[in-house]
Swiss-Prot record:
SUPFAM superfamilies from the UniProt entry: Zn-binding ribosomal proteins (SSF57829)
GO terms of molecular function: structural constituent of ribosome
Organism: Leifsonia xyli subsp. xyli (strain CTCB07)
Keywords of the record: Ribonucleoprotein, Ribosomal protein
Family the entry assigns: Belongs to the bacterial ribosomal protein bL33 family.
GO biological process, one term: translation
Protein name: Large ribosomal subunit protein bL33
Stored HAMAP family: Ribosomal_bL33 (MF_00294)
GO cellular component term of the entry, any: cytosolic large ribosomal subunit
InterPro entries: Ribosomal_bL33, Ribosomal_bL33_CS, Ribosomal_bL33_sf, Ribosomal_zn-bd
Amino acid sequence: MAKQQDVRPIIKLRSTAGTGYTYVTRKNRRNNPDRLVLKKYDPVVRKHVDFREER
């Protein structure tokens, strides 16, 4: 069973281009308490765009 407040939860990164494309990753809550923003490739628009953490 997973702990209630897991240190490394699984999060979804949703594209800011509005395509609905998502990546799934893990993050360390102690080192990064704020929402994560990564620049990754969105194959729908065929560009690198910002992906923001979705809660």
